[in-house]
Amino acid sequence: NLVTGSPAADGVTALFALDATVTLQGPSHERSVPVTSFYSGYRTTVRRPDELVVRVSFELPKPGAAQTWRKVGTRKAQSISKAALAAVAETEEGVITRVGFGAASVAEVVLPLASVRSLVLGKNVHSLNMNDVEEAVDSEIRPIDDVRSTGRYRRHLMKVLVKRFLQALA
């Protein structure tokens, strides 16, 4: 799932939310790449033909961190997502101190929703402006129409999934 570069890679969303690092090894070298930089385009990665993925690493969230993984599909199992979101957040006294997102099936690659992260990091969960959150999601995703869903519905889903996660922090 990680190396195929699929924009619908549900499991990869968690790696994005956790800010994972992918370690690649070739015949005479080893290098590490943030998972958010691992994908170079639709179904393409920065992995060279002579490299293997040998490790995926990430820092575990602190105990009590909020975490979610949501997949919306036509069926309950074995369905390619209309949209999927993984999110992790740590708070201290209501202030978001760490947050990460991974969004699938809303662009040509899995997205970290960096604009949403920048918007909410360091903010009090009770003072988040959900209209601003929606605008940040809207500005970053690029969903398409295909046999599974419309781009319009995917856009709506991602806004709802992100807002529900952030509202649950309060």
Where are these regions (language model features)?
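C-terminal structural segment of proteins
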Residues: 1-170
